[in-house]
Amino acid sequence: MGEICPRREDFDIDYILKNASLLEKVSLLAGYDFWHTAPLPRFNVPSVRVSDGPNGVRGTKFFDGVRAACLPCGTGLAATWDQSLLYDAGVLIGQECLAKGAHCWLVPTVCIQRSPLGGRGFESFAEDPYATGKLAAAYIRGAQSTGVISTIKHFAANDQEHERISVNAVMSERALREVHLLPFQIAIADSAPGAVMTCYNKVNGQHLSESKEMLDGLLRREWGWKGLIMSDWFGTYSTAEALNAGLGLEMPGTTRLRGPLLELAISSRKVSRATLDERARTVLEFVQRARKAEVSAVESTRDFPEDRRLNRKLAADSIVLLKNESGLLPLNPQTLTSVALIGPNMKTAAFCGGGSASLQPYYSTSPYQGITSQLPPGVEVLYETGATSYAFIPELEASEVRTPEGQPGLRMRFYRDPPSVQERRVLMGFSNPELDRLFYADIEAELIAPATGPFQFGLAVYGSASLFLNDQLIIDNTTVQRGGTFFFGKGTLEETATVDLVQGQSYQIKVQFASGPSSKLVKPGVVNFGGGAGRLGMVQVVDPERAIARAVEAAKRADITILGVGLTRDHESEGFDRSHMDLPPAVASLVTAVLDVAPDAILLTQSGTPFSMLPWADLVKTHLHAWFGGNELGNGIADVLFGVVNPSGKLPLSFPRRIEDTPTYLNFGSERGQVTYGEGIYVGYKLLRKSPTSCALSIRARFVVHLLCVLRFDGRHRVRYTECSKLGRRGRSGSSPAVYRGRSNNVVNRTSHQGAQRISKGGFAAR
């Protein structure tokens, strides 16, 4: 960790509010830049840094940021059902914030996953509001124990990405309070986060960032909450309305709807001086609390052994054993002579979801790396991809190309003028002050073909771009553009071209790029982050039938087959929702083909939210589900497979067989600017009673033999039970009993609330 940033002397808030000018007070109510609050040097008020990242602290860059610890995604953490473990995870996050120079962490997300298709569903915890609130509170308490401020978000019902800044979420008062507000209410009461972030969407006709009823009425007066209320990034839509409603801080800076507009609102008496002072006070109190965190003076790293151990435990304890019908698990590596490791997720370290969850990890471990590291020498490993599962063509790696100067990677040059202008002047750096909103760039590299055969190139862009190979145009993403999911949903569809290459031959790559304002796309309801973005990919074309045939042959030869399939951040991301629950097309064919020749194959699936398991759901005998598992994904999986850790994870979400079986099948996504929450309070398992949310098995085949529930005088319940195990093997042991609490014989239909807590038993399983 870098040198500690020196603290400034404290400041007197009452004195500032009495003596600061109108312009100074107004300046406090919007960000200074993308990641910092505005300072008041005259009063010794510093600028404080905020940082995003639901599974790690990203720092101040969207791309190529400082490396960071990556924890399992929110649903993975929730699968542990372990509040003390989430507290420890929060402490690690807080320490990462300090290393990155961040006073405030813009997490956690507690919006309920009402549909499996929600793009950011993996960021939140569980479909049960009580469980989500309790787990979030533990996470927040851990982070804030380091002095860092935590920001709970997105208040409220921000559970879909489709037209997220304009969609109106229409629901009953009961559904709003019992499902979508309850996680916030519980977490705020139990952990006192330093800030609340409002959502992009409307609820019952009004944007939350300008709802006086929700911010001043419910959050402030009814719940008695005193902290800062900030907007989501570019989620402020008015000046006077938002300020009068209770929104203290517009983010990011520089301001769009405050500054001179707020000065005008005050002079025209649409906003009173008293209201201005109230909002300025909440910002100053936030800064005063945040400045006490002992943050690093520069963005730095802290990849310590104890952090790795905790992250490995988080990854392992989140894994859910869904089936062990043949009793195959745990595997004894000493008895194996050959292992087939098959599937597109086997060598892919799907450690995080997309969007705000993306970061540069200190390191990552794929399932392949984790499994092979625990195999004895001499065990034959048969690896086959079997199928492709990417939604975007894999990005060009620096090792595959070199700059015109001979260095690994691509060279990018920025210009104010388009390529048609003669003798353009190169401007150094993306943040050059001479660059206008509309700017241009040339990206160049030399590619040495790694093999002979057809290769597919892909180009997606926010802005416009064209790809040339040896001066020949192969992809035009400028003249005609089709809307896609790239860059938070603002960009184009990935356009592709297939070209035959010869191994060892040199090819010149050039991309002509223009920034965001050059885009021809008009997308309602999508956040505009400005700037521009592009993605360039290349992959060798693989015949799907041959790939499956090779995988089948490997499965026939091996003692044990482990099949790794699932989703990645290409499929689950901020900015877009999934259009279906299916895995990539070739994956289902791969699974059924392998199970046909190796019926005892171990299936390892990965995702942050539910996916369809048809047509192989009833064929597989041994099934583990892992999540986006962070840095230690592969090691955590291997620990469970080989019995180092007993899988105690439970599903925090219902995994329906088909999307048609979900309560939100007919009412998810914006239709004419509105989505109706027709399921009411019956979200997830509350409707799917026959498929309990917390379903899972344990290798040690535990069962309860005695159960006693006592209602205490203080109104709390105490549940006591005796648990036995049929198997015992050395390794970490534990269980996460799930308890459903509800009322019976009610005139009004009521749903249960779910709670659970992990119970550990030391080195051996109880017998």
Curated annotation (Swiss-Prot):
Q: Kindly provide the name given to this protein in its UniProt entry.
A: Probable beta-glucosidase K
* Pathway it works in: Glycan metabolism; cellulose degradation
Q: State the function annotated in the UniProt record.
A: Beta-glucosidases are one of a number of cellulolytic enzymes involved in the degradation of cellulosic biomass. Catalyzes the last step releasing glucose from the inhibitory cellobiose.
UniProt main location, coarse:
secreted
Active site residues per record: D232
Superkingdom to which the source organism belongs: Eukaryota
Q: Output compositional bias ranges, type Polar residues.
A: 743-757
What is one cellular component GO term in this UniProt entry? extracellular region
> Could you tell me the EC number(s) of this protein?
3.2.1.21
- UniProt similarity note: Belongs to the glycosyl hydrolase 3 family.
Renumbered to this chain, region (Disordered) spans: 727-767
Question: Which parts of the sequence belong to the PA14 domain?
Answer: 405-552
Q: Which UniProt keywords apply?
A: Carbohydrate metabolism, Cellulose degradation, Glycoprotein, Glycosidase, Hydrolase, Polysaccharide degradation, Secreted
Pfam families for this protein: Glyco_hydro_3, Glyco_hydro_3_C, PA14
Subcellular localization is given as: Secreted
One Gene Ontology BP term is: cellulose catabolic process
Q: What catalytic reaction does the record list? A: Hydrolysis of terminal, non-reducing beta-D-glucosyl residues with release of beta-D-glucose
Top class in the EC scheme: hydrolase
Glycosylation sites recorded in the entry for this protein: N19, N324, N477, N749
MF term (GO), any:
beta-glucosidase activity
